[in-house]
Design a protein with these regions (language model features):
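Residues at secondary-structure transition points
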Residues: 1-13, 68-76, 100, 104, ...
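N-terminal glycine-rich phosphate-binding loop and ensuing alpha1 helix
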Residues: 1-40
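Alpha-helical elements of Rossmann-like donor-binding domains used by nucleotide-donor carbohydrate transfer enzymes
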Residues: 17, 21, 76-80, 108, ...
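Residues at the starts of beta-strands that form the adenosine-phosphate
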Residues: 31-34, 89-90, 163
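Short phosphate-binding loop-to-helix
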Residues: 42-90
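Conserved beta-loop-beta/alpha segment of the NTase-like Rossmann-fold superfamily
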Residues: 71-138
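A generic structural signal for short hydrophobic patches within well-formed alpha-helices
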Residues: 106, 140-144, 183-184
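Conserved alpha/beta core of the MobA/IspD/sugar-nucleotide pyrophosphorylase nucleotidyltransferase superfamily
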Residues: 146-204
């Protein structure tokens, strides 16, 4: 099956858009670490190549974890990420197919969660519509590790929704994930206040 995360958006794989923004944000916050959980060796190789190409002295706050069971459902990616995070104080789960999610929203979401969601979960919203990413303090780790099949962190989030902290994004489009693309399609992404057109190509 084709891997949508490797679709090229103007010569850049789709997963790289949010990935690159996360790296920039984490580089500004030395206490934050980014863990890439993937079942795809191609993505692991690309991330490692980026790490090797980083300028000497530049912090590349990324750890890569291959999760061979992720094809069984989202729960296995969640569990692999938590195990790799060790004694982290909290977990923030981002998905790689949200190329519209901005750098400003990444940083704003994480900073708000650190301030206001130390003991409760959180997620992003737009006009009352909830979406990814989702945040959990470490005390929810046991429940997250009990997830099975295609149940992601949102299943645990719903149990505690009345206590949750929410972060409002600026644009509805930021919450869109890309579940299907034709072989060539035009997409529009707003970056730094400027709307850009991207041509999307499938890697054969």
């Amino acid at each position: 099956a084709e891997n949508k995360l490797l679709y090229l958006l103007d010569e850049k794989p789709m997963f790289r858009y949010l990935f690159d923004r996360l790296v920039k944000v984490c580089q500004r916050h030395p206490e934050w670490e980014m863990i890439v959980v993937t079942q795809y060796p191609e993505i692991e190789h690309q991330v490692k190549a980026l790490q090797e190409n980083e300028q000497q002295g530049e912090r590349f706050p990324v750890k890569t974890v291959i999760s061979k069971d992720s094809y069984k459902g989202a729960a296995y990616s969640v569990k692999a990420g938590i195990r790799a995070a060790g004694d982290a104080d909290a977990y923030a789960f981002f998905v790689a197919d949200q190329p519209y999610f901005t750098e400003e929203s990444v940083e704003g979401f994480l900073e708000k969660m650190e301030r206001e969601a130390k003991v409760v979960p959180g997620c992003v919203t737009w006009n009352g519509q909830e979406g990814n990413p989702v945040w959990f303090p470490a005390k929810y780790g046991k429940e997250l590790l009990e997830l099975e099949g295609d149940a992601g962190g949102r299943k645990v989030f719903r149990r505690y929704r009345e206590k949750a902290v929410f972060y409002e994004v600026s644009l509805e489009k930021e919450l869109e994930d890309i579940d299907y693309m034709p072989e060539i399609e035009k997409m529009r992404i707003t970056e730094g206040g400027t709307e850009k057109t991207f041509h999307v190509y499938v890697i054969e």
